[in-house]
Amino acid sequence: MINKIDNIQTDSEIHMKKCIKNFKTNINNIHIGRISPNILNNIRVDYYGISTPLSQVANAIVEDSRTLAITVFDHQLIKSTEKAIFMSDLELIPISYGNTIRVTLPALTEERRHTLIKMVRTEAEKSKIAVRSVRRIANDKTKILLKNKEINEDEEHFFQNEIQKLTNIWIKEIDIILAEKESELMKF
């Protein structure tokens, strides 16, 4: 019985850590001073009717601190690649030159800073929801153990408190990362 609870707790912690890792990855794609090919990680291109990650249909390299050169592998995908970049929430404007698409990072205005901060806050909220979802799943599993009389009510209550402590720790971690990123965005 205790072993099952430990497994649930361990699994919950692993999933919560993954939520934090995904959050860090997502906000690290939000750059302000220097452009990086990673900024394109979440962009998907219509590849003959299939939504495909941009990295699988093109190669992006840094030309200078504010410009990316994207070489599309299949010449027929240039228009759909341009459209995917333009339609993303990154506010990038793609310009094609033959098989190459150039993307320039927009100038960082006060309005752009606030837009980026909103994006980071949205990602933070999504991550908090994901952590809380892990908590809910763990609590549901303990309720099943209680229902099956594998644990008693005291054990269920204790375990739910432990999961809540974990949830609080990871949500606080998200808040710390968010504050650091907001500070970084306001410095530039």
Swiss-Prot record:
Biological processes per GO annotation: cytoplasmic translational termination
Listed GO MF terms: ribosomal large subunit binding
Entry keyword annotation includes Protein biosynthesis: yes
Annotated localization: Cytoplasm
Gene3D superfamilies documented for this protein: 3.30.1360.40, Ribosome-recycling factor (1.10.132.20)
Keywords: Cytoplasm, Protein biosynthesis
Classification via CDD domains: RRF (cd00520)
InterPro entries: Ribosome_recyc_fac, Ribosome_recyc_fac_dom, RRF_sf
Keyword Protein biosynthesis carried by entry: yes
One cellular component term from this protein's GO annotations in UniProt: cytosol
Recorded family membership: Belongs to the RRF family.
Function per UniProt: Responsible for the release of ribosomes from messenger RNA at the termination of protein biosynthesis. May increase the efficiency of translation by recycling ribosomes from one round of translation to another.
The protein's name: Ribosome-recycling factor
Source organism of the structure: Blochmanniella pennsylvanica (strain BPEN)
